[in-house]
Regions:
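PAPS-dependent sulfotransferase catalytic domain
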Residues: 2-79, 83, 89-103
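C-terminal accessory extensions appended to soluble enzyme cores
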Residues: 99-128
Length: 128
């Protein structure tokens, strides 16, 4: 499947409810996922203003499974993180470290997603 044609309802439904997400891009797959999350939630995805979103990414089963794993529930986030310490990046130049970010409205699309894979996997394990 090509991502632009990949509009599973669970992705749209879940993303529409997310206000916060925790993402760290360490490899190409996580970089891909940040593109996906950014595109589907209407949030800018990079600190390079000239970077073009790749339209023809092939989405594998592994991508889909990892993408589901990276959808962090807002309720869990609110319990896990002290909201007063939530980092909201509006200055792209400040994005240098891992941290929670609050999803800004689409009218302010300057943000970076930072996924701590271990924390997300542990959370998913708790749900089983």
């Amino acid at each position: 499947a090509i991502w632009k044609n990949y509009q599973q309802s669970y992705v749209i439904e879940t993303l529409s409810k997310l206000n916060y997400i925790y993402v760290r891009r360490e490899n190409k797959l996580e970089h891909f996922l940040s593109f996906v999350i950014a595109r589907e939630s209407g949030i800018y995805h990079t600190d390079n203003l000239n970077e073009i979103f790749p339209n023809n990414i092939i989405v594998t089963t592994e991508h889909m499974e990892l993408f589901q794993s990276y959808l962090v529930a807002e309720k869990w986030f609110l319990e896990f993180a002290n909201i007063s310490e939530t980092i909201v990046y509006e200055d792209l130049g400040e994005i240098k470290k891992d941290g929670f970010v609050k999803k800004l409205p689409y009218t302010k699309p300057k943000i970076e997603y930072i996924v701590n894979k271990q924390e997300v996997l542990e959370y998913i394990e708790c749900l089983k």
